[in-house]
C-alpha cells in the first residue's frame, strides 16, 4: 500500500494521505515543518504534524479568506495579512490593482523559505513590489503598532496551539480593530463548525463584543478533515453581501472558486450553526 501520513484530528478521527515522497523535514525556532508530495493532494505543507495547505485544494481556503473582504471593503489600498507563510493569501490580495501596499507579518521565516522552495504554485506573488514582508510575531506587531492603519486585515492563523494560539485572543482582535480604518473590514479563519464547534462559537462571541457586524461564512476544504471550514467577516460598518461588482469582475476570471454567486451563498448558514450561535 505504500507510505501514508496521518493527521490526528481528535481521539477518534484521523485523516491519511498516501505519500509519494518527503521533500523537506526540518525544525525552525518555533515548530517542525514538513513538505510531502502525495498521490491525491499534490504537495502538502505540514506544521507540527498538522496539514496546513495543499496544492490540490488551497484555492478553496485562500480565495474564501481573502476575496469576500476585499470585495466589500470600500477601500483596499492598504492591506495587512497576519500569518499565511505559504503565500496563498497575499497572492489573492495582490490580484487586486487597487491594493497599493500589502504588509505581511509572519513569525516563522522558515515557513516562508520552505514554501518558496517547494510550493511554487501557491505563493506566486513573493516578488510583487507592493508586498512588505516582515518576520515578527503577529500579536506583538499589533500590540506595538501605534498609528498604522489598514483598510483590510486578514488573519491567516493556524489552529490555536503553539505560536498561533495568541491569534485567537480577544486582546489580539481588539488590537486589530484599532488598526482598521473606520470603514475597514477584517476577515479571519475561524475553524471547523463541526469538529471545533466550541472554539468556533467562542470566537464569534469574542468578535461580537468588538464589532458591530460579525458574519461567519462556510465553505469546503477537504484537507482539513471535516470537509467544512469557517471564516468570519467583521466590520463596524457595511454589509458582507454588498460587494463592489467592478472589483469582483476584475478577479473572477482568474479565480478557481470565488464568484459573485458564491459570495452570496457562503453567508447562508445551516440550522445547526444558527442554533449554536443563537441566531
Show which residues each predicted segment covers.
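N-terminal glycine-rich anion-binding loops that anchor highly charged ligand groups
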Residues: 33-43
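SAM/dcSAM-binding transferase cores
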Residues: 1-34, 205, 226-279
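The AdoMet/dcAdoMet-binding core of the Class I SAM-like
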Residues: 2-4, 28, 53-185, 195-199, ...
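A general beta-strand register signal
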Residues: 46-47
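A short, structural micro-pattern
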Residues: 39, 106, 225-228
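Glycine-centered loop/turn positions within well-structured domains
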Residues: 43, 140, 239-241
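C-terminal substrate-binding/active-site "lid" region of AdoMet-derived donor-dependent transferases
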Residues: 164-240
Amino acid at each position: 500500500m505504500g507510505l501514508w501520513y496521518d493527521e490526528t484530528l481528535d481521539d477518534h478521527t484521523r485523516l491519511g494521505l498516501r505519500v509519494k515522497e518527503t521533500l523537506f523535514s526540518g525544525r525552525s525556532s518555533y515548530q517542525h515543518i514538513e513538505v510531502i508530495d502525495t498521490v491525491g493532494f499534490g504537495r502538502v505543507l505540514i506544521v507540527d504534524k498538522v496539514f496546513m495547505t495543499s496544492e490540490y485544494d488551497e484555492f478553496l481556503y485562500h480565495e474564501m479568506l481573502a476575496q469576500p473582504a476585499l470585495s466589500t471593503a470600500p477601500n483596499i489600498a492598504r492591506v495587512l495579512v497576519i500569518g499565511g507563510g505559504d503565500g496563498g493569501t497575499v497572492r489573492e490580495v495582490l490580484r487586486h490593482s487597487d491594493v497599493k501596499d500589502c504588509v505581511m507579518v509572519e513569525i516563522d521565516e522558515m515557513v516562508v523559505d520552505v514554501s518558496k522552495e517547494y510550493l511554487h504554485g501557491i505563493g506566486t506573488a513573493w516578488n510583487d513590489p507592493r508586498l512588505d514582508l516582515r518576520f515578527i510575531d503577529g500579536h506583538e506587531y499589533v500590540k506595538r503598532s501605534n498609528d498604522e492603519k489598514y483598510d483590510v486585515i486578514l488573519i491567516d492563523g493556524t489552529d490555536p496551539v503553539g505560536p498561533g494560539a495568541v491569534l485567537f485572543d480577544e486582546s489580539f482582535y481588539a488590537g486589530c480593530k484599532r488598526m482598521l480604518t473606520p470603514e475597514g473590514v477584517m476577515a479571519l479563519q475561524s475553524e471547523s463548525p463541526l469538529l471545533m464547534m466550541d472554539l468556533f462559537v467562542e470566537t464569534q462571541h469574542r468578535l461580537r463584543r468588538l464589532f458591530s457586524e460579525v458574519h461567519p461564512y462556510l465553505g469546503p476544504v477537504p484537507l482539513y478533515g471535516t470537509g467544512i471550514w469557517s471564516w468570519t467577516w467583521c466590520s463596524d460598518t457595511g454589509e458582507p453581501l454588498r460587494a463592489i461588482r467592478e472589483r469582483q469582475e476584475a478577479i473572477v476570471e482568474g479565480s478557481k472558486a470565488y464568484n459573485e454567486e458564491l459570495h452570496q451563498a457562503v453567508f447562508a448558514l445551516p440550522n445547526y450553526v444558527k442554533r449554536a450561535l443563537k441566531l
